[in-house]
Every structure is written in structure tokens, then in C-alpha cells.
A protein has these predicted regions:
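A short, N-terminal "cap"/entry segment at the start of jelly-roll beta-barrel domains
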Residues: 1-65, 146-174
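A short beta-loop-beta micro-motif enriched in histidine and acidic residues
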Residues: 59-68, 77-91, 113
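Long compositionally biased, domain-poor regions of proteins
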Residues: 69, 77, 99-104, 108-112, ...
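Hydrophobic beta-strand positions in blades of beta-propellers and related beta-sheet-rich domains
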Residues: 69-71, 116, 137
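Short acidic-glycine-tyrosine-enriched beta hairpin
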Residues: 92, 105-122
């Protein structure tokens, strides 16, 4: 069975494989083909154990100055008690494989594939993989912009499997 969501599997291309996938970077955008996400381009973050990641977007002048996106891969027993080092950012986690065990503001949560977690700034949270399977998720981080007259948003935990799709007009539900 193929995965419902994309995530890199790492590894190295065969020596006989023609490598035509190339990332493209401009001042306005970046295109990162999935074939470029191999073991050689993984990164690591401080305070994360048994975890590697692929950087999809990171702060850089002209592209994403206040925004980053990673595809995280947490091995069994891995995770972090201090995942976010900047309390001025908000974050979104989207679980694409495995199960995440989160502690958010003192409450425990088990978030499975298809799970979505919105983390407002200054949220106290941890994330661990307590299973025998690899946990993979997208982590999107953005500098929080407060709006005068609006409270800071609440934590949101949901799963796309529990949400009825909204059909767009004139698409015959396709």
C-alpha cells in the first residue's frame, strides 16, 4: 500500500540512476523536487534526539524571512522536551506517518496520521515517538503577528479524517 501523504524516505540513488532532479532557488521562490530529498541533505535541530529533517523552506532574504517548513523524521524513542526554541513563533504540525505523543501546556495527546496541531506562540510543548515505527510530520513555523483587539489563538488539535470535505462549486465533487 502506498502512503497517503508524501514524505522523503532518504537513502542514496543508485550509481546507475540519472540524476535530473535539481532544486531551483530564486529571489522569489524555491522549487525542491522530491528526488533531491536524500540522506545527504538531511539536517538536525538542537534538543531533538533520534531525529533528522529535510528543510523545505527557511528564513532567507527575499524568500521566507519569517517562515520555515521542515519534514521531520523521528525514530522510535526520539523526540524533544524543548522542540521550539523561539517563543515568538506559532507552529503547525501535520502528521503524515506514525503517531506523535505530545504534551501541550501540561495535557497529553496522541496524534496519529492525518493529525493537525496548531501551536500558538509561547506554548509549552514536547513531542516524542513512543512507538516502534518512524514518525514523520511537516512542521511549519512562522513569526507570530499580534493583532490589536484580538486574543492570542488557542491550541487546535484535529484530524483530517474527522472533517467532512467541503465540495467546491462547479467541480462535481471531484
Amino acid at each position: 500500500m502506498s502512503a497517503k501523504y508524501f514524505y522523503p524516505t532518504g537513502g542514496h540513488p543508485g550509481q546507475e540512476q540519472l540524476l535530473t532532479d535539481r532544486a531551483i532557488f530564486t529571489n522569489a521562490y524555491a522549487v525542491i523536487p522530491k528526488g533531491t530529498m536524500r540522506d545527504i541533505v538531511t539536517s538536525y535541530l538542537p534538543f531533538w534526539d533520534k531525529t533528522r529533517l529535510w528543510v523545505i523552506a527557511r528564513p532567507m532574504t527575499g524568500f521566507a524571512e519569517t517562515f520555515s517548513q521542515y519534514i521531520m523524521e523521528v525514530s522510535p524513542g526520539g523526540g524533544s522536551d524543548q522542540p521550539e526554541t523561539d517563543m515568538g513563533v506559532e507552529g503547525v504540525l501535520f502528521i503524515v506517518a506514525g503517531t506523535a505523543f505530545l504534551k501541550i501546556n501540561g495535557e497529553n495527546y496522541k496524534v496519529e496520521e492525518g493529525g493537525y496541531v496548531f501551536l500558538p506562540p509561547e506554548t509549552d510543548w514536547t513531542l516524542h515517538n513512543k512507538t516502534d515505527d518512524i514518525l514523520r510530520f511537516h512542521w511549519i513555523r512562522k513569526a507570530y503577528e499580534a493583532v490589536v483587539g484580538l486574543d492570542k489563538p488557542d491550541v487546535i488539535i484535529a484530524n483530517e479524517k474527522d472533517i467532512q470535505p467541503t465540495i467546491m462549486p462547479d467541480t462535481d465533487g471531484k
